[in-house]
Amino acid sequence: VYSGNYINDIEETEKTLGFGMRADILAQAEEICENFRKNRSTDIVVLRLDHLYCIPRDRKDVNNICARMCLECLSEGYIKADTDHTFSMLFEKDAVEYIYKVVSTGKHEYSLYQLSSNDVVSELELAAMVQEHMADSANIVTSSGGIGRCVLSGTRFEKEYGVHAFGDLNRNIEKMAAYMQKHKAVFVNEDKLELPWWKVLWNQWKWLLSVLFPF
């Protein structure tokens, strides 16, 4: 819901200013939730997740900038990076803990929280991490898109819930690179990922265990 260059971290009170259909839809969805909360006097909370990422299992899961850079390195032999773009990365496991805190709390001080982390990084820095951990001679192709610095502040959430991200971006990139290299054919050629029977069973039922035992 935000685009452009912000010198300071963006607080929840900052007016939304995004570009494109996706940004418009998200902003309208937030407004609908807020209006419904006020009109119905219900406890509705909107959560903004800042650049969520995870280790993809196959090509269809490549939906974040980290995985996209790893895939470019594997398939194209180069990594594209915008020299002007700086942002924050939130690992999937941290996001799960954050959301659990909100869900398990009976009363919320605010109706809007931004889930962010201290992993503020530029595209160029991120590309360098990928290049290092992919152990590849791929070049980093830079461009200047004028996107700027756009980092969501997670201060409101941290003050109320007393938690902060514990994921290590560099370490997670290392794990992602190792996994994608190991299963290169799955990502580059889109071959079917072959798993042992116990992993297939685990993937089918792990959601239930996550609900029963969140941590």
Stretches found by the model and what they are:
Residues 1-23, 38-40, 57:
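Active-site "gating" loop of Rossmann-like NAD(P)-dependent oxidoreductase/epimerase domains
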Residues 2-4, 47-64:
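Flexible, glycine-rich beta-alpha linker
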Residues 18-30, 63-67, 88-89, 120:
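Short-chain dehydrogenase/reductase
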Residues 19-45, 74:
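Active-site Tyr-X1-5-Lys
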Residues 28-32, 36, 65, 69, ...:
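Hydrophobic alpha-helix immediately C-terminal to the catalytic Tyr-X-X-X-Lys motif of short-chain
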Residues 45-47, 113:
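Hydrophobic/aromatic beta-strand patches that form the interior of the parallel beta-sheet core
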Residues 50-52, 58, 68-90:
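A conserved pocket-lining segment of Rossmann-fold NAD(P)-dependent short-chain dehydrogenase/reductase
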Residues 81-211:
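C-terminal substrate-binding subdomain of Rossmann-fold SDR/epimerase-dehydratase oxidoreductases
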